[in-house]
Design a protein with these regions (language model features):
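Short, basic (Lys/Arg/His-rich) helix/loop patches that form interaction surfaces
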Residues: 192-267
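Flexible interdomain linker/hinge and immediately adjacent N-terminus
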Residues: 1-18, 78, 177
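Short functional hotspots where side chains directly engage DNA or cofactors
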Residues: 65, 73-76, 215, 241-284, ...
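C-terminal secondary-structure termini that scaffold catalytic or DNA-interacting sites
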Residues: 275-278, 290-324
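Basic, Lys/Arg- and aromatic-enriched nucleic-acid-binding interface segment
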Residues: 11-49, 259
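Conserved tyrosine-mediated DNA breakage-rejoining catalytic core shared by Y-recombinases
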Residues: 54-169
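Short, structured motif recognition centered on aromatic/hydrophobic residues
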Residues: 9, 41-42, 52, 96-103, ...
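A short, glycine-centered helix-capping/turn motif at helix boundaries
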Residues: 41-54, 230-235, 258-259, 269-272
Length: 324
């Protein structure tokens, strides 16, 4: 997606705004801030749907005793092939989630508290959270259990609750009317409804809409297509000559990660092989995007979101990266 397409998808499709950024009073969707936060989290991390949609509050540093800033958390059970890696969440994405947690999530949690209390025997009731070690301890089916958060599969995350302001509430960041984590069908429904709104409100100011509706995975592609050329230009300088750029790209396949944008982004995405990430370079060669401005104001209102991501990626890459 381009910048304009992403903002249209997030703000008009998911967020209930009109194309001119005014409130859409005919909007009949639920929890627009949830959709916006989900989109910002997906784009800001480059993670797969199963990774960002199942994230828990402690993983983003949200909750009593947690530090609030940019966050890092480890995925394993919800990652593709169970491959362990570290996901970095920039401050703007955290801010977007904070807005949702402040304005919408409490009402959903309050409405579902009694229902969850009746079902507590079927839920994993978390009693202690170790933010430093990334572990939780609680009761499931009458048995005391302890888990590394990264090792918790999606079905366990969905039934994880803790004692909140209104009683039992989900430990998941994103919740629906039932009080627990939305499933794949729910997120698909949110996306389809967003597409219908985007098409219905399209006018001459609307950015180009593709023939097929966007998928959540397209935000992951956008992350790669923005971050990869940004790192390339930052580390190796701009190269307008197409043939030279292609030679440089081929050299990335065997280069050292410390000086290699391809391998840094490959690790960020959790690709099993740099060859998979290499495909993105074919798209960057046409220079469609204005890379100098590409990373400004994509997520929140700040100016450093993707520059922050790039700086963190370079820092991690220089030290060998996260967990491969």
């Amino acid at each position: 997606m381009t910048f304009e397409q992403y903002r249209y998808f997030r703000d008009v499709g998911l967020g209930g705004q009109l194309p001119d950024a005014q409130v859409n009073r005919s909007f009949r969707g639920s929890a627009p801030h949830r959709g916006r936060a989900g989109a910002d989290l997906a784009l800001g991390t480059g993670s797969r749907w199963r990774e960002w949609a199942t994230v828990l509050l402690p993983e983003l540093g949200i909750g009593p005793g947690a530090a609030r800033s940019a966050a890092e958390f480890t995925v394993q059970a919800c990652a593709k092939y169970g491959k362990v890696r570290t996901i970095y969440v920039p401050e703007d994405a955290i801010d977007s989630v904070d807005t949702y947690c402040l304005l919408e999530r409490p009402e959903l949690a309050r409405a579902a508290a009694r229902t969850l209390a009746r079902k507590h025997r079927d839920l994993f009731v978390v009693k202690a959270i170790d933010y430093a070690d990334g572990r939780v301890r609680g009761t499931l089916q009458g048995v005391e259990r302890e888990y590394a958060i990264s090792a918790m599969p999606a079905h366990l995350r969905r039934i994880s609750v803790h004692e909140g302001e209104f009683g039992l509430e989900a430990l998941a960041v994103f919740i629906c009317r039932g009080g627990l984590m939305p499933g794949a069908d729910s997120w698909k429904r949110y996306r389809h409804a967003a597409w219908r709104r985007m098409v219905g409100l399209a006018d001459e100011t609307t950015p180009h809409l593709p023939a097929k509706r966007w998928r959540w995975h397209d935000l992951r592609h956008t992350y790669a297509l923005q971050l990869l050329p940004y790192l390339e230009n930052l580390m190796d300088g701009e190269e307008p000559d197409h043939a030279r750029r292609q030679r440089r790209h081929r050299s990335y396949l065997t280069g050292h990660i410390r000086y290699n944008p391809l391998l840094i982004v490959s690790r960020r995405l959790g690709h099993s092989s740099p060859e998979t990430t290499y495909a993105y370079l074919e798209y960057t060669d046409d220079l469609i995007h204005d890379f100098e401005e590409a990373f400004r104001n994509w997520l929140g209102d700040g100016e450093a979101t993707y520059a922050q991501i790039a700086a963190h990626a370079l820092g991690v890459g220089a030290n060998g990266g996260g967990t491969p």
